[in-house]
Structures are given as structure tokens and as C-alpha cells.
Amino acid sequence: MSRKKRKRGRGRVLILVVLLALIVFGVFARGIFTSGKTTTEHAQRELHTYAEQHETSLADYPDALVQLYARNPDARDFVRDYPKKKDLTPTIDLSNLSGSKTVPLLLQWDERWGYREYNESIIGLAGCGPTCLSMATIYLTGDTTKDPLWMCRFAEQNQFNVPGSGSKWALISEGGRMLGLDVTQIPLDKDRIYRNLDVGNPIIVVVGPGDFTTDGHFLVLTGHSGDKITLNDPNSPTNSAKSWDCDTLAGQIQALWVLRRAG
């Protein structure tokens, strides 16, 4: 074999190796980037197909819901059902949660209340704060009438809401006390967090941009095992099923309140 042919052969092998590497890297990178999410354009295509099959239209979906569909796979059924169910007012009965030994996970986009108005939006998009306070109140008092819809109306009546946005932090501190809870804001201190979780005190936190939100979001810390914390994310059963490293959360937490039953 001539030297030129050997060089051409090695060149072809090198090209194949590079192409294979690019293909593998491309697939791997896409998997990391999407992490279950999808693009807005892809979400629009999926919703358009679904709408055609169910006698609705893509135009029936507000842009904010299309974005929710794209970024949160857990909420996709809620988004798909919006045109058909947005005007329904189903009965809300959480009596099965009375006496719960753990903080119940409630989702802001539960179809029983998620389509109802809140803050010039809907609870499913803007109701994380009231939903967190609802979880803690039901757990601490056993009063299952304080569901997320009730809590949103409570927030509006007492001006704890921010029209066009979310909820004021005062919803947790002042609002919690108005509901008969003992609410204490605490510093970001691991030992204090762990001590409260060890005795069953839920901790409502506000987090900034990071694993849970691009803006601001409320969560309920519910327990821990060593430095791993369990939490209820009102926007994600997936996040709620994980254990989170305390240091990971600490870099995102902006405020914390310990809640107890007063008296």
C-alpha cells in the first residue's frame, strides 16, 4: 500500500471517529440540557396537535401556560385540560388529610383549584405561597377547609398578594399568625433548621433563581436525614420526591419561617 493511500485511510478513520464523537456528545448534551423540559416551539406543536384532537385551539392556551408546559413535565395534563376545565368549579374536599402525620403535598396546579383566578393570573401559575401556607396549616391544625383556593382568597382579602405577580412574604409571617399559628423567621442556620425539622415544625422558605425557579418561589421544608432535606414543592412532585443537599438549598434560600401551632 502506498504512503498516500495509508494517509487517506487514516484520514477517513479520523473523520469517522470525530463524527461519532460529535453524535454521542450531541445526544448527551441534549439530554443534560433538556432534563425533561422542552422548547417553547416544541410545546406549541404538541399543544396544537392535542388541541386539534380535542376540538380546541392553540389560541385557547395563554402564553404563560405554554411556558409551564415547556418547563414542567409534571404539569402537562393540567395545561392540556385548560380549555375544557378552566371554567369548572369542582368541589374541594381535603378531609382525608385531617390528622396527617406528615406535611401533605398540595400542588398549585391541582385541577380542583389551579384554574381559579389569583393575582390577575391563576393559582396554577401564581399560587405557590398560598399553597405552601395551606399545606402547613392543614398539617398543624387539621383544618382541611384551609385549602389553596381558600388561602388565595385570604391573601387577596388581606392584601398579601402582589397583583400581576405572586405573594408577599408577609403572607407567611403576618398571615400565618392571623390563622392562629406561631410563626418565627429564622436565620439560615443548619443546626436550627435541623432542630425544628426534628420536632416536626415545617419551615416555609422563599428561594430565588436556581433549581426551582427563575424568579422567586415558596417551598415547605418537611424533614431531613443528615444533611439531606426533604421538601414539598407546590409546583413539582418530582422535586418533592427528591432529597436535597442542605448546602445546595442554602445557596438559593432568601428567607425562612418556622411554623408551629400556637399555644
PLM region descriptions:
Residues 14-15, 20, 201, 255:
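Low-complexity, intrinsically disordered short peptide segments enriched in small/polar/basic residues
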Residues 3, 11-18, 24-160:
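Active-site-adjacent structural segments surrounding the nucleophilic cysteine of cysteine proteases
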Residues 25-52, 93-94, 101, 138, ...:
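Conserved active-site-adjacent core of cysteine acyl-enzyme catalytic domains
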